[in-house]
Amino acid sequence: AVAAVPPKRELRWTMLFHDLGKPLCRTFDEQGVGHFYGHTAISAQMAEDIMARLHFEKTLRDRIRAQLACFDDMFRPERAAIHKEMARLGTETVQNLLYTKQADNAAKVPAGLERAQAPWHEAQKIYDELISEGACCSIHELKISGEDLAALGYHGREIGAVLARLLDEVAAEK
């Protein structure tokens, strides 16, 4: 899975770290099928410890931490759902999440790979469309600013709250 992501440090480290906790969480159900409940949190903590010991620079640690935090997030391959995730996590984090999901699936589902990958390929296609259209994915990209809201009589934190609500509405494509 590590080799299946683009050669970016944070992606390669994320793929290496994301399943570290599985051996500590492995259980078997009645049919003898293995499960790894809670491995995400344990993997993230183990990654934190390793990154601290290896003295990773803060920006790299932050990027890896962000990827690990949303690694198990699932979103529907629908335009509004992906747009909302792009607004919530940032466009780069969503792109990296798509890379890591596709690589993770490729590593564990050899039979029926195309069917397992189909939702992620569709999500990637939608992501690419949103990027090429210049979709608004952050407060700074809104056509209205805090200054505009202040001119309309909004004050302080209320301005940030209104901008956040507007971004949510734009991302939901309402």
At which residue positions do the language-model features occur?
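Charged substrate- and nucleic-acid-binding regions of tRNA-handling and nucleotidyl-transfer enzymes
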Residues: D49-R53, K108-K174
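Divalent metal-dependent catalytic cores for phosphoryl transfer on phosphate-bearing substrates
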Residues: A1-A116
